[in-house]
């Protein structure tokens, strides 16, 4: 999971592309998911995601941590553009929305660390 770099390289799309590219190229055999969290001060949009995907086939999905509106955007503009891209829910309270309304295929949650069996049952 690739988180945005916000402290030393800035929040511009170019800075984020360089950051993600450095990581993706360092481990081209490792499947990777971009972690989008607007709370970091940068929101990864579809243009940047698909720009990266052109160069890095190990980019397989998108984890959305921005809430229902951002999750819907990710589904409509990123993961629904290809059958091979995965959408992961990152906000515990949005798991239902992600699965029911957005076609999410997984969730990376905080509560899963506390109640792993119950979360796996979902």
Go through each PLM region and give its residues.
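Short beta-strands and strand-loop turn motifs
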Residues: 1-5, 30-36
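Glycine-rich, proline-tolerant flexible connector loops at the mouths of alpha/beta enzymes
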Residues: 1-17
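Catalytic alpha/beta core domains of metabolic enzymes, predominantly
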Residues: 22-30, 37-122
């Amino acid at each position: 999971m690739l988180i945005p770099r916000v402290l030393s390289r800035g929040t511009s799309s170019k800075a984020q592309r360089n950051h993600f590219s450095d990581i993706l190229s360092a481990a081209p055999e490792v499947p990777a998911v971009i972690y989008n969290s607007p709370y970091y001060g940068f929101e990864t949009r579809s243009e940047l995601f698909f720009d990266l995907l052109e160069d890095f086939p190990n980019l397989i999905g998108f984890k959305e941590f921005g809430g229902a509106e951002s999750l819907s955007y990710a589904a409509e503009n990123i993961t629904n553009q290809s059958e091979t891209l995965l959408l992961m829910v990152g906000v515990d309270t949005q798991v239902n929305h992600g699965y029911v309304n957005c076609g999410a295929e997984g969730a990376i949650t905080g509560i899963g660390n506390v109640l792993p069996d119950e979360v796996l049952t979902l």
